[in-house]
UniProtKB/Swiss-Prot annotation:
The lineage of its organism: Eukaryota, Metazoa, Chordata, Craniata, Vertebrata. Keywords: Cytoplasm, Differentiation, Spermatogenesis. GO terms for cellular component: cytosol. Residues 95-116, 903-920 have a biased composition (Basic and acidic residues). This is Protein TOPAZ1. It is found in: Cytoplasm, Cytosol. One of its GO terms (biological process) is cell differentiation. InterPro entries: TOPAZ1 (IPR038952), TOPAZ1_dom (IPR029435). Its main location: cytoplasm.
Length: 1694
């Protein structure tokens, strides 16, 4: 699409030099005519209007056109525009007079304020001096920035009418500013008052904000100085409506034709170095010239035609966003330093083409609408106050919408090469700003800026190939020229495939959430402003640059494709503008239609940054690296890779452009000589870029996934890309030397030139590094990515020191300036050496010939970026697979122009799904990663500090690992050190931190892995396609030991070997093939043996290899058999010596499995056990340590005391509180098993336990073990033996000194070594105490002895037991002697000392075998005989009345003695009217407790009836009732008279419940005549001898029994008769007794409740009174009492 010519007078104000350059570069092509004139601008405006009606683009277009006019000569700009755009019409250029006027009106106040501020800061060079070299320099235009901000602000407000007025004002003001004398661009005092004046008049006539290069804030604050002409920061794409950050490939090398350009560039570089101010003054014309110089690049981006559509849509959105963002709060100024340029790091921003362009536009529209709400960084950046916005800030802050990502910010960052410290400060300050993104000019931003500055587009442009039709059409469009045409409108609109285009990776999915526009890494890192930015700064440097390049490439392709698809160039430009912004995203999903060419290898500094002005939308589209579209397909890669000779080669046949090889290759890459020859041979005429087919569906799935989540796991992305996508294209794809980390493979430094086109999706990722690649990214640790130039050596990344194009883009003298060499650590670059097959390859970077960018400008050379996976350039293997630049065994020194390329694959996300043993990972460098293997880059230090897998950290980058592994590597000093590295200190610190974290993480992961974990998991690897991935690590830069080399390919799957031969065919170098064949052999044949002599019956892989046995079912034994303990010991020793985590874990398994089955034998070596435990502790395998110690205790092979102390120390140091209980348990077991500790050891252990905050119980357990050991130690030191103690005992006996005897007992107790001796001594004491019976003294020897012993402070249960047994012996002795008083004194002493002697036995004599019943009987008898019933009962209670139990058996004599004793006690107690105690004694008579006792309980009837009678007599109704119940329950015969008396007493006492219960029991026992026969005949016979209570109870039973008949309605006439029966013996009784019985009957009826009425009816034949029970009273009683009465009387309780 063509850019519209500048409107109005702006077209005329361009320096002649620029015009001359345009003419020289111009190669008329189809549609080229419209490039420069106003007519073309009109046409473009019309298209823009159709596409951008709602965007208010026209006004902005005019404003930008005004800017561009000032920037470049009219003629030159026109030509450039014509050639660069070739029929591309920038939709944003259309101008609407009304819109301009409205914009002007609205913007006047803002412009006035901004203009004032900017005048203080900016001094514009005289407009007279045309500076063609300004292609590499961006001059910030105050006017354009103001207008740009205003337009953005207005657009965000959605005020189109106002926007138009503001635009008119802006244009007027711009014209005025152009007329103003050259201003001095001075950084704001806020940016540390760095005032910079441009030495030359290079920038006099350039518009203040030319080509939308920088965000308005950037314009205000600083000027971008492009070092080595590599960095052409691109602040904003055409019509940065969405402010999508175009990620300009900071390394794009814009070569000016004129020698004056070279001089200007040098002066700029020098001045910028001295002033540390990147000069932003670069006219759009110059940029377009660079595009011309890089015609080939356009071809690279031709393949991205499809991507252009999305880019254009993004551009539209971006433009609207920019307008809306106008008027925001000015960002803080950022001080720039020359170091910024030097520290520029490549950032290949992973580009992803959103599958659905329409969806993308929708998202953009949504994003635009939400921009004000979300406070997108763009809005913040685009504030009226002219706050400088770093390009990377936009990238970092890429808010949740595509809009938020603005290349302008990124460019600004590139432009503002500010020291990291100021950036950090500013970023922290900016965090307080609305989104925290205002301080976009953070370290990260500057890093990205820096990365932009020094990088050539070739390094960073990652090309995707669109469909062949798109490519062909695009090729035809740019067939004549890829020159960048600068519309007179000032908008930087490049041809779809022009060199200057920036390919933005757009999310094609409209459904992508705003946050989804953050590529997985970028969202996290960008949003995390508060996160330490220095970590991401490095990444940003690389990211910004990579993104820029990738955006350039993709934008070209996408724009070209869109160009064809959509006639409206408006969409194209807008989309392209949007697309570059997306490039910021860390792991963009790359549209499968496009193939990314890993151009980094050949990034010859031809990285062209499209200068996208506000209106020019195509600016962001891409920097086409190729001039001739058709030829450029293959020529770009070829040129980049092979362009090493200074002699110009004709890259574009039609244009007749020559490529300056020296300048072309800025990325110093070590290339195999044969490969270089291949690359150099032939012209690129027949070069064809293979097209990716049928990839849209799969890619869409990937895009959909990426859109669904903010953070994208590289593993997920890799997994999502199935092999189907790759298989279709693998024959046409070259294998990239770098491992592709899906999200953050910052391959800038390690740029591996060739990448499988099938991997294009990943290539972009691999080359695109978002700032979030650092810790802020997905869980990624801060790491100086290989992409960062400084990381090449300073970060010491293992992969290889790949010098970015920019790094060596200029003369070796310029190396220090090149951003790629801005090492974070400011360490001199020492020669990088790597051992390949034992041959050490070393090349000093300073010795490598670097293309001179300035010389390239002087010679007017066109720098081309080469598609590295092009089969035509690099050849195709027999299988049709692309050959890849493999590890170069030697640096091609024959061609000095070719910079040695070290592939430091910064595959941060290349997690190897391989289950590898850590050692394997450490020593194996996967050279090829087949399919989609995602290996953790396992690099190893020369010191063999092995890095373990860190699968849990998806973001672990090779850069991080490399940092760790290469710490010990000795790198040769480079001839020149990097001078201005702002990243030095901070990046150095970051590297260290990263290394530490990586070590920890890797260690944590690996310690849990077994050797079998080294196997690659096919599921994760997803060998979708047998296309070998790029080399994970290149040999040349690595100092690999032989051991490491042997296992370098260990991570390959079997599928990898399949492609090794195919790949090797591409190499003509015999040594190269030999090297890979050697690796192939290593993979196929065997794992390196550990050197153990293993019997044949055992699996040699399990025992004798690092990875172990991988066979699912192994027929060989994995555990030694019995008798082969020597094999175990040998294996343990070997594993301990190797000290590999996996081997140690295997040793644990072997140890556990073997010694669980078999006991230790003669070959068991305790030292091996100790060494194994030490090794496990060093590897933090505490669980395994506990397992082994526990097992060793079981087999009685205790570890050393030192091991135990080490375990305690480890637990205390690591604060492992949860491990303390298990450790205390092990400690106690060890002590009990015989481990001896000194008191100081105990004290130390207790101290450690306090340190770990152990509980009181745990510490007490340790102290108890201490006391036990102390006692043991004391016994060892005891001098007195048993004989001496016995002698003393006899002496005490003679003297009768029982107190001294007690002290002797205490001493013996403390000093006796054996408990048996102690028991013997105690027996002697008992005998001594019981043999003084002849002594008539009243004192009791035992009591004095017991008193002395009990006073011992250390008196324990043991002492009480000994005293109790001695006391029993004494008691029995006195019982035999019938000395009841003395025996009682002994018992009382035992009671006093609370010694439970009833459960003890005597020490001597028969008491030693006496039963418990006997001992109790003796004691009770002593009390009883001594007159103490309480004592006797106490003894019985103390013994729990136990007589004969299984636990305490006794003989019949003991039972009989107990019976007699209890009966005696009962009688004595009952005599004392102690009924309760008596009943207690009687209840425990033999026969009641145990069913085994065969004692007849009926014999106790007398005792119980006596007790019952006594209780009744004493009116103890409660006790009487209890006794009666017990007798009835135990079937003890009861006296009925006592029972009837009890019932009567209970009734009269109103205890009716118990009375009824006993009456019912009495009925059952036969105490009363049966009632059943008469109850149901309505006749009740009551004996006359019953009491009134008994009569009433009988009447109740009678009524309840006839309740049914009484309660029935018809039975009221029935009569209930009661007969007062005379007893048989009544005849002997007087009539008074019978009459008393009648009265009792009447009384019984009255005491009833309710009362009953009894009527006398008659007298029967037997002269017995007959009464009738009144029916009504009976019915009433039943109604009130039937509920309980029925339960009591009708149901039996038995």
């Amino acid at each position: 699409m063509r850019r519209p010519p500048p409107l109005g007078p702006t077209t005329a104000s361009g320096p002649e030099g620029n015009v001359r350059n345009l003419q020289k570069r111009q190669a008329p092509g189809p549609g080229a005519a419209g490039g420069c004139g106003p007519e073309a601008g009109g046409r473009r405006e019309n298209k823009q209007k159709r596409r951008m009606v709602a965007r208010a683009t026209p006004g902005r277009g005019e404003v930008e056109s005004d800017k561009s006019v000032a920037a470049s000569g009219a003629g030159k700009a026109a030509r450039r525009r014509v050639e660069g755009r070739r029929g591309q019409v920038s939709p944003s250029d259309s101008s609407d007079p009304r819109g301009l006027e409205a914009a002007k009106e609205a913007e006047l106040p803002l412009q006035t304020e901004r203009h004032t501020k900017e005048k203080r800061k900016v001094t514009e060079a005289s407009s007279d001096d045309p500076q063609p070299g300004l292609d590499l320099v961006r001059k910030e235009s105050l006017t354009s920035s103001e207008s740009f901000q205003t337009v953005e602000c207005l657009q965000s407000l959605g005020k189109e009418s106002i926007i138009e007025g503001i635009k008119r004002r802006i244009r007027n003001k711009k014209l005025k500013s152009l007329e103003n004398p050259p201003l001095k661009i001075t950084e704001n005092e806020a940016t540390q008052n760095i005032k910079v004046e441009f030495q030359d008049e290079l920038y006099k006539n350039t518009p203040k904000y030319s080509c939308n290069i920088l965000s308005p804030e950037v314009e205000n604050n600083s000027v971008l100085k492009l070092r080595d002409c590599n960095c052409f920061p691109h602040s904003k794409g055409c019509n940065d409506e969405n402010n999508l950050p175009y990620k300009p490939d900071g390394g794009c090398m814009h070569v000016a034709e004129n020698f004056s350009k070279k001089e200007n560039l040098r002066s700029l570089a020098e001045k910028s170095d001295t002033n540390s101010i990147p000069q932003l003054l670069q006219t759009e014309e110059n940029v377009m010239e660079v595009n011309k110089l890089l015609p080939e690049e356009s071809d690279l981006y031709q393949s991205k035609t499809n991507g252009l559509l999305s880019c254009l849509q993004h551009e539209k959105n971006k433009y609207s966003i920019e307008e809306s963002s106008v008027g925001r709060k000015p960002r803080k100024r950022m001080k720039l330093s020359e170091k910024a340029d030097e520290t520029v790091t490549e950032m290949n921003f992973s580009n992803e083409y959103n599958k659905s362009e329409l969806m993308l536009q929708e998202n953009q529209m949504i994003a635009d609408g939400k921009e004000a709400e979300t406070k997108s960084p763009l809005n913040v950046l685009r504030k009226v106050s002219h706050n400088t916005v770093s390009l990377m800030d936009h990238l970092l802050s890429v808010p949740e919408t595509v809009e938020k990502e603005t290349s302008s910010e990124h460019h600004v960052n590139a432009v503002f090469q500010k020291t990291i410290e100021p950036l950090l400060k500013e970023e922290t300050e900016s965090t307080s700003e609305p989104l925290g993104y205002e301080s976009m000019a953070s370290k990260e931003d500057f890093k990205s800026m820096k990365s932009f500055i020094g990088k050539s587009p070739n390094e960073y442009h990652i090309e995707r190939r669109s469909s062949r039709e798109d490519l062909r059409s695009a090729s035809e469009e740019l067939n004549l020229s890829c020159q960048r045409t600068i519309p007179m409108t000032g908008k930087r609109t490049w041809p779809c495939y022009s060199c200057a285009r920036i390919s933005a990776w757009c999310w094609k999915k409209a459904s992508l959430p705003e946050s989804s526009y953050f590529f997985p890494g970028s969202q996290e890192s960008y949003r995390q402003v508060d996160v330490p930015k220095h970590q991401t700064n490095q990444t940003h440097l690389t990211d910004s640059k990579l993104l820029l390049q990738s955006s350039l490439t993709e934008t070209n392709t996408e724009s070209s494709s869109k160009e064809k698809l959509d006639s409206n160039s408006n969409c194209l430009s807008s989309v392209s503008a949007v697309e570059p912004t997306l490039m910021v995203i860390k792991e963009p999903i790359i549209k499968d239609d496009k193939k990314i060419k890993s151009e980094e290898l050949s990034r010859s500094g031809s990285e062209v940054i499209s200068n996208t002005t506000e209106d020019t939308q195509l600016t962001s589209e891409t920097q086409s690296l190729t001039g001739n579209k058709k030829k450029a397909r293959g020529n770009l890669m070829k040129l980049n890779l092979t362009a090493t000779s200074k002699d110009g080669q004709e890259a574009n046949n039609s244009a007749g452009k020559t490529i300056h090889r020296k300048a072309c290759i800025a990325q110093q890459t070590f290339i195999v000589p044969d490969l270089v020859k291949i690359l150099n041979t032939g012209r690129l005429t027949n070069f064809k870029i293979p097209l990716l087919k049928n990839k849209t569906e799969k890619r869409k799935e990937v895009n959909a996934k990426s859109s669904e989540r903010e953070a994208y796991s590289p593993l997920e992305l890799l997994d999502n890309l199935s092999g189907a996508d790759i298989r279709q294209n693998r024959s046409k794809e070259n294998v990239s030397m770098t491992m592709l980390g899906p999200q953050t493979l910052s391959i800038r430094n390690s740029v591996t030139p060739v990448q499988a086109s099938s991997d294009s999706f990943y290539n972009k990722k691999s080359y695109s590094i978002s700032p979030s690649f650092t810790k802020q990214g997905n869980n990624s640790k801060p790491s100086n990515h290989v992409s960062e130039p400084g990381n090449i050596v300073s970060n010491k990344e293992v992969a290889s020191l790949t010098v970015e194009n920019n790094a060596f883009s200029c003369d070796p003298g310029y190396v220090e300036k090149s951003p790629s060499f801005c090492c974070n650590e400011q360490e001199t670059f020492r020669p990088v050496s790597s051992e390949v097959r034992g041959r050490k390859i070393t090349k000093n970077f300073s010795e490598v010939g670097f293309p001179d960018i300035l010389k390239a400008y002087e010679d007017d050379i066109l720098l081309i970026d080469v598609i590295q996976d092009d089969p035509d350039l690099f050849g195709v293997s027999n299988e049709g697979e692309l050959s890849f630049t493999s590890e170069v065994p030697k640096i091609s020194q024959e061609e000095p122009n070719v910079a040695g390329e070290h592939q430091s694959t910064d595959s941060k996300y290349m997690e190897t799904p391989v289950k590898k043993e850590p050692s394997d990972d450490l020593r194996e460098l996967p050279v090829l990663d087949c399919g989609w293997i995602k290996p953790d880059i396992c690099a190893s230090n020369s010191a063999e500090s092995e890095i373990k897998h860190d699968p849990k950290d998806v973001n672990t980058s090779l850069g991080e690992v490399a940092n760790e592994t290469s710490e010990n590597e000795t790198l040769g000093d480079f001839s020149e050190q990097i001078k201005g590295s702002d990243l030095d200190e901070k990046h150095r610190f970051t590297d260290k931190v990263i290394t530490k974290e990586e070590k920890e993480n890797i260690y944590e992961v690996c310690k849990s892995k077994d050797s079998r974990n080294a196997d690659i998991m096919v599921g994760e690897c997803q060998f979708a396609v047998p296309v070998p991935k790029p080399l994970c690590l290149l040999v040349p830069p690595l100092n690999l030991s032989g051991r490491q080399e042997d296992t370098i390919l260990n991570t390959w799957m079997n599928g990898t070997i399949c492609f090794l031969n195919e790949i090797l065919l591409a190499f003509g170098n015999i040594e190269t093939r030999r090297f890979f064949y050697q690796k192939q052999k290593t993979i196929k044949v065997f794992q390196k043996s550990l050197g153990l002599m293993i019997p044949y019956k055992y699996c040699k892989f399990h025992f004798n290899t690092l990875r172990g046995c991988e066979r699912p079912l192994c027929k060989f034994a994995h555990v030694p058999e019995q008798g082969d303990e020597k094999v175990c010991m040998d294996v343990f020793k070997k594993y301990i010596n190797i000290n590999e985590l996996c081997l140690l874990q295997r040793a644990v398994n072997i140890f556990m499995e073997y010694y669980r089955k078999f006991p230790p034998g003669v070959y068991f070596d305790l030292q091996v056990l100790n060494d194994l435990l030490n090794s496990l502790l060093k590897h933090c395998l505490l669980k395994e340590v506990f397992q082994i110690v526990n097992l060793s205790i079981m087999v009685k092979m205790l570890p050393s005391l030192k091991i135990l102390l080490n375990i305690f120390e480890y637990v205390a140091t690591m604060k492992l509180r949860n491990a303390v209980p298990a450790l205390i348990d092990i400690f106690c077991k060890l002590v009990e098993a015989g481990m001896v500790l000194d008191p100081e050891h105990f004290n130390y252990i207790v101290k450690l336990l306090y340190q770990v905050q152990a509980s009181k119980q745990e510490i007490t357990a340790v102290l108890e073990m201490k006391s036990r050991l102390q006692m043991r130690q004391f016994k060892k030191n005891w001098k007195c033996d048993l004989h001496s103690a016995l002698n003393k005992l006899e002496h005490c006996k003679e003297k009768g000194d029982w107190t001294k005897l007690g002290k002797l007992y205490i001493n013996v107790k403390m000093g006796c070594e054996k408990f048996a001796d102690f028991q013997t001594f105690c027996a002697c004491i008992a005998e001594t105490l019981t043999k003084n019976y002849e002594d008539e003294r009243p004192d009791i020897p035992f009591c004095e002895f017991a008193e002395t012993v009990s006073k011992d402070p250390q008196n324990s249960k043991v002492d009480k037991g000994v005293l109790g047994r001695i006391g029993i012996s004494a008691m029995c002795f006195y019982h035999k002697l019938l000395q009841w008083s003395k025996g009682r004194k002994v018992l009382e002493k035992l009671y006093e000392l609370k010694i439970h002697f009833t459960s003890l036995k005597g020490l001597i004599g028969p008491e030693k075998l006496a039963s418990r019943c006997q001992i109790v009987n003796v004691a009770a008898e002593i009390f009883l005989k001594s007159g103490s019933l309480d004592g006797a009962i106490w003894v019985m209670r103390e013994s729990e009345w136990i007589i004969n139990t299984p636990l305490w058996p006794c003989d019949r004599l003991d039972v009989l003695n107990r019976h007699n004793l209890l009966c005696t006690i009962a009688h004595e107690i009952l005599a004392k009217s102690l009924y309760r105690q008596t009943f207690e004694v009687l209840q425990n008579l033999p026969g009641f407790q145990n069913s085994q006792e065969t004692v007849e309980v009926s014999q106790y009837s007398l005792l119980f009836n006596k007790l019952l009678g006594s209780c009744i007599e004493s009116s103890s109704l409660g006790m009487s009732s209890s006794v009666a119940e017990f007798m009835i329950s135990k079937s003890i015969p009861i006296d009925f008279s006592f029972l009837r008396r009890l019932i009567t007493s209970l009734g009269r006492s109103c205890l009716w419940l118990k009375a009824r219960a006993h009456y019912k029991s009495a009925l059952s026992l036969g105490c009363y005549p049966p009632l059943e026969g008469n109850l149901y005949r309505k006749l009740l016979l009551i004996p006359s001898y019953l009491s009134e209570i008994e009569m009433l109870l009988a009447i109740e039973i009678f009524m309840v029994s006839n309740a049914s008949s009484i309660q029935s309605p018809g039975t009221s006439t029935q009569i209930l008769q009661i007969v007062l029966k005379r007893c048989e013996d009544n005849q002997s009784r007087s009539s008074d007794d019978y009459q008393a019985a009648v009265e009792r009957l009447i009384m019984a009826a009255r005491i009833s409740d309710p009362k009953l009425f009894v009527k006398h009816m008659t007298v029967n034949v037997n002269k017995e009174q007959v009464y009738s029970l009144e029916h009504c009273s009976a019915l009433k009683w039943l109604k009130e009492n039937m509920k309980w009465a029925g339960k009591v009387w009708l149901f039996s309780n038995h």
